[in-house]
Amino acid sequence: MIDFFLNSEYLPAGDQPKAIKEIENSILLGNKYQTLKGVTGSGKTFTIANIIKDLNRPALVVSHNKTLAAQLYREFKDFFPNNAVEYFVSYYDYYQPESYVPSKDLFIEKEATINTEIEIKRIRTVTSLAKRRDVIVVATVSSIYALGSPDFFKKSAREFSVGQKISIKEISDIFVELYYERTLMNLERDKFSIKGNIIEIWPSSEHGEFAYRICLDFDEIVEIYRISSFSKKNLGTTNSFTLFAKSYFVIPYKNVLEAIPKISYDLNLQCQYFKDNGKLVEAERLKQRVEYDLEMLRETGFCSGIENYSKYLSGSEMERPYCLFDFFPKDYLLFVDESHVTLPQFRGMYNGDYSRKLNLVNFGFRLPAALENRPLKYDEFDALINQVVFVSATPGLEENLKSRVVVDQIIRPTGLVDPEIITRHSDGQMEDLYSEIQKRVALKERVLITTLTKKMSEDLTEYLVSLGVRAKYLHSELDTLERVEVISLLRKSEIDVIVGINLLREGLDIPEVSLVAILDADKVGFLRSTTSLIQTIGRAARNSNGLVIMYYDTISVAMREAIEETNRRRQIQVDYNKKNNITPKTIVKKIQNILEKELNNKNKNINYDLEKIISGERLSKKKLINKLKFELEEAVNDERFEDAIVLRDKIKELSSKISVARNK
């Protein structure tokens, strides 16, 4: 077994050593629940990495959105370059679920656009879990949605090795059995080609880097090469490789044959139920739809919406569907990042899905078994937990009640302390805010201002600009690239102020920000709860001059609690710094991260591919643009804003050159 190797030039510091030790001791004692209560900027991710390394167990890290999950994924990839760090999030760029609106008698067909690159990462995730133990998976709520049987997937593995006695036809049959398709054209992902005594395959779990070439002589494998997927260049030989099914929804054909009579039986029962209750339209509708699906299953082993029959096809007697958790070994560790947000999100997934599908069942669009293709109920999710560490600066009631151990991580390795908080009455707040902005601009520092509505953020930005302040607003109506550019402008000092609404959702941890101004801090609601206020205060915790100003009419309970908790932490941090003679220093974060060698190589390949495209060779326009768009999304999620803008420009350049080439 390969051990986890943590790659870092730093050792745990501040409260990290204590937190690591206490969490590890709790886990080794067999406690199921523990909480890491770490302030913003205290290095919670590094603490998690050390726990994984020390306990040497597979780990699942779940976050509440794709952006934060991508940031964690990049950090863990850097921490563990020699281990399998995988990424498992929803692969839909667009998703309109199948639904029925009774009031309008409107049936809406399922529509979806799948992100191929994300799908590859998902397949790589289950492949890694099937092959090895040194695996860290960073995931979102997708981790509790239905997947195929882990046993079927693991049993799909086929090994090919030099010296193996096997014919081209036998290899071809195995590939087809694993859902790969033969192509007579250029090799593509999920396909294989045969030319004489050579067979090539591009595994679904490979990220485009390479494929395999198997050379045979008299029904014996004599050589296996790793080759470039696009150029077919030889990348070296290997003695063997293992191939898994191209999808984690592996359904043996015998299961399909066994499922058909069960589906027919339930169809008759449900149709009879509709007829007995005078629902003749529903009975006829269901009969037509399911009989068509059954015919497709008999002929091809597949049908549209096959996931709605997963209860019959899985061969499992379980009352819940399989999910990502089932692919992990029993001793895995779960880390729930930002647990105060993530746990409520997990809790709410089942009910929304159930109510939508219940309409489909009640009105004859689906069999009742379709209700079993669903996310886990919260108690099912909880039952699948082996041992968990909840991670949050502001853990909720559930984490505090369940955890046998709650560990504070208050002291930052940088010596930075929580910001000072000043409360000011809202009378004359605009003039006061303008004055404070001017002070920060003079020091070449930045300002974040949080409002309650989009209209307020736009109006305030317009007002500040009219006074000569370099300001931009930031909210959900801006697309990804526009948000990227606004943040990039702030970091490069081309603007001094960002006015936003939910700055937590934007994931704004910008060390240049020394002032956070909270307007209407006393208003009751989600954005001004104790938890949200503490999290917002943390936006100023990465600068040694951090200051928070709360503008109010009447000091609210949430304000008082947030101020008291922040002051408690601040005092502990100040006392520690005095005792250890530490001078806090603002975090230095490069404005433009120099691209790693890997990305530089990719960019060189991009230029090469542009020429290939223009001359009509190799990679198609659609594939290359999709590849660049995926890299753009990764750059945005990693906060590599300069890289994102470069990639955006390359996409525009490619589209332009293709257009010119076609017009010649």
Curated annotation (Swiss-Prot):
GO cellular component terms, semicolon-separated: cytoplasm; excinuclease repair complex
CDD domains per the UniProt record, alphabetical: DEXHc_UvrB (cd17916), SF2_C_UvrB (cd18790)
UniProt subcellular location: Cytoplasm
Helicase ATP-binding domain span: 25-412
Keyword Magnesium recorded: no
Signal peptide, first to last residue: none
Domain of life: Bacteria
Pfam families xref list: Helicase_C (PF00271), ResIII (PF04851), UVR (PF02151), UvrB (PF12344), UvrB_inter (PF17757)
Domain UVR: 622-657
GO biological process, one term: SOS response
Residue intervals of the Helicase C-terminal domain: 429-595
Chain residues that bind ATP: G38, V39, T40, G41, S42, G43, K44, T45
Motif (Beta-hairpin): 91-114
Coiled coil, from the record: none
Record keywords: ATP-binding, Cytoplasm, DNA damage, DNA excision, DNA repair, Excision nuclease, Nucleotide-binding, SOS response
Gene3D superfamilies per UniProt: P-loop containing nucleotide triphosphate hydrolases
Single annotated GO MF: excinuclease ABC activity
Entry text on domains: The beta-hairpin motif is involved in DNA binding.
Known role: The UvrABC repair system catalyzes the recognition and processing of DNA lesions. A damage recognition complex composed of 2 UvrA and 2 UvrB subunits scans DNA for abnormalities. Upon binding of the UvrA(2)B(2) complex to a putative damaged site, the DNA wraps around one UvrB monomer. DNA wrap is dependent on ATP binding by UvrB and probably causes local melting of the DNA helix, facilitating insertion of UvrB beta-hairpin between the DNA strands. Then UvrB probes one DNA strand for the presence of a lesion.
Assembly mode: Forms a heterotetramer with UvrA during the search for lesions. Interacts with UvrC in an incision complex.
Protein name: UvrABC system protein B
Organism encoding this protein: Borrelia garinii subsp. bavariensis (strain ATCC BAA-2496 / DSM 23469 / PBi)
